[in-house]
Amino acid sequence: MCIRDRFKEEGLNREVLRSWIGRKILTELSKTIKVPNDNNGIEIYNTIENLLEEKKEVSTLDIIKAIPSEEITLDLDNLILIISSWKNELAMQQNLISKLNNLEKINDETPKKSDDNYISEFTKINKKIYASHRVKPLEVELWKSNKTNQNKELIIFMPGLGGEINNFKWIGNALIKRGWPIVFIDHRGSNLKAITEVLEEGQSIPGSADFFLYRIKDLEAVLKSHENGEFGIPNNSYILMGHSLGALIALLYEGNKPTVQLEERCDSAFKDFAVTNLSKLLQCQISEIPFSEKNNANKASAIIGFNTFGSLVWPKENSSGIKTPTLLIGGTYDLITPLINEQFRVFSALNNPSNRFLIIEGASHFSPIRINNSYEENNDVFKISESFIGSNPILVQDLSAKFLVKFLENIRDQEVTRVIKNQKDLGLNFHLLDLETIKEVSKN
């Protein structure tokens, strides 16, 4: 493992070393590379700091050679455990694809795009919401139909960590045409601007307050504005939608709050550096957040989550307490929040028979993110390699839009969305599954 490659590629180098995530990684590294009287990894930390001053790349071997100790012990059992976890994750992914391809084909009719009743005229409004947890006002972008007879629920969309509103306007376009108003939240402190400042200006990496506390309070402020009629929508109903961290915030807001057992589960999860499931690094910071005891009286009409995570928060079936109809969307090429060990577990923690999981083969964690229409020029701060994007993201987004619109329409019509197995549309293999089938394909 090349540490400099990992840190430098993410643009986090020294900032990561000094962050909560860096401390966790170093603690686990010190369990494999053991230095006498250095249980907290201080010697390893200082060694990496010094090496990064001198070298462009720092490998594990570089660290071992540079540690100022005559005696170093390598825990081979721990190394084998780490390697085994990687192999197991890959094997599970390959086994899942095989099981999906062996599903009996059911329902070959995918939702059709229709120009009927499309709304062509709508308004985009940049609004500022003053909230006590923010020094500067919260910024949101509201999309509303110009027709006055629309009475659909307000959709609230939350981007993931380092995301921005522009990445998800394809969702806004699909929904506003069908009459749904949508508000996009710009979460200052964990948005694209904040991560850019970390990567390019050496600012401190955001912490748990930015990741969770302020995001939840942002959502509360938006909902309060909606209830007070500040968006000009003639109801107080809402639908929550988000990508990755944004989806987790939606679930945290609507569901049971984390318990004291979260910290214990996190200690166990870090035995393999959590590198096979990077979302664990974020989930385990939730234990630092003080959650309100009261539950929100008004509930979402639906939840839509892309590349969702939260398996450490709700590890058991039905443990989330969420009975809201939910559609989760994920891909078989997601290496950040793997389907079997992360997204499927979150899905099983939900509790509504109409819930559905859209699996798109070849789609990755980054597939919902639209940088531009062609992807030929990637000016995104993360410079995501094509090898990590997976199948054509525009097609993945178009297919996702079809199904999320159909899911929401079915809820309004009080219809249950049909299960679809082993079908193809837009050149993509996909499956729209219920919990029973998810359990079936998840079995070892």
Where are the predicted features?
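Conserved small/polar residues in nucleotide/adenosyl-binding loops
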Residues: 1-5
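N-terminal cap/lid segment of alpha/beta-hydrolase-fold proteins
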Residues: 97-150
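Short beta-strand element of the alpha/beta-hydrolase
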Residues: 151-160
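Gly/Ala-rich beta-loop-alpha elbow adjacent to hydrolase catalytic centers
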Residues: 160, 241-250
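Cap/lid segment of the alpha/beta-hydrolase catalytic domain
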Residues: 162, 166-169, 173-177, 183-213, ...
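Alpha/beta-hydrolase active-site loop
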Residues: 204-232, 248, 252, 262-277
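Alpha/beta-hydrolase fold nucleophile elbow
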Residues: 232-244
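Short beta-strand/loop motif that positions the catalytic acidic residue
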Residues: 322, 328-330
